[in-house]
């Protein structure tokens, strides 16, 4: 996902937040933010589907042009302007009863869907493909994949935390140390968000995204 663009004169800040939700469950949030110009558009179709599912969206991926995919339940999908190959893969997986584990898509043409334990399909960076093939051969369970518009990527399995560069890997490792088992993560051209068992850690994300997470 990459739906924010940096504005001139951005200033980084660090903040630690503890949120108290309506049900009194406290979700620790910690990380760094920057001031971004939010250019996300055209998300009404996807949000309408999420409303039809009573807010129960399990997975999702968005681009800065408003294209994206949301997943409900095992493999129920709704998408807007998804790449034809990506859409065909999603339809086939649903028809075959495969459980979708992770999805990602970019405006620049990258896309990937992980299903079952470690099967996957998509158009992805060469280095990422090499990593996924190795994890598939090792029979590792692939939990999550993410790709940014400029080709940064991350992979989370039951044995490895992999990223396209040392900065991405460092964020994943720090998140695990702070909040335990990593469940999902998203990498953009500039930032990373990691959802762990006991909290959420983020690096260099838009202040607007931080505010949205605080409001959950």
Language model: regions and residue ranges:
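Trp/Gly-enriched beta-strand/coil motifs that build multi-repeat beta-propeller-like domains
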Residues: 2-216
């Amino acid at each position: 996902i990459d739906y924010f663009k940096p504005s001139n004169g951005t200033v980084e800040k660090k903040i630690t937040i503890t949120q108290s939700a309506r049900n009194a469950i406290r979700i620790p949030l910690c990380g760094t933010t920057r001031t971004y110009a939010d250019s996300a558009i055209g998300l009404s179709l996807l949000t309408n589907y999420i409303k039809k599912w009573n807010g129960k969206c399990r997975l999702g991926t968005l681009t800065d042009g408003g294209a994206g995919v949301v997943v409900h339940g095992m493999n129920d999908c709704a998408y807007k302007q998804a790449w034809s190959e990506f859409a065909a893969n999603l339809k086939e997986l649903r028809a075959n009863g495969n459980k979708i584990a992770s999805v990602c898509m970019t405006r620049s043409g990258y896309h990937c869907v992980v299903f079952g334990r470690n099967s996957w399909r998509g158009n992805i960076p060469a280095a990422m493909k090499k990593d996924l093939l190795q994890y598939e051969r090792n029979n590792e369970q692939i939990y999550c994949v993410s790709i940014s518009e400029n080709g940064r990527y991350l992979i989370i399995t039951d044995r490895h935390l992999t990223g396209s560069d040392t900065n991405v890997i460092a964020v994943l490792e720090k998140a695990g140390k702070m909040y335990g088992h990593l469940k999902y993560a998203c990498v953009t051209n500039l930032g990373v968000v990691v959802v762990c068992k006991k909290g959420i850690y983020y690096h260099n994300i838009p202040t607007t995204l931080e505010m949205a997470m605080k409001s959950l």
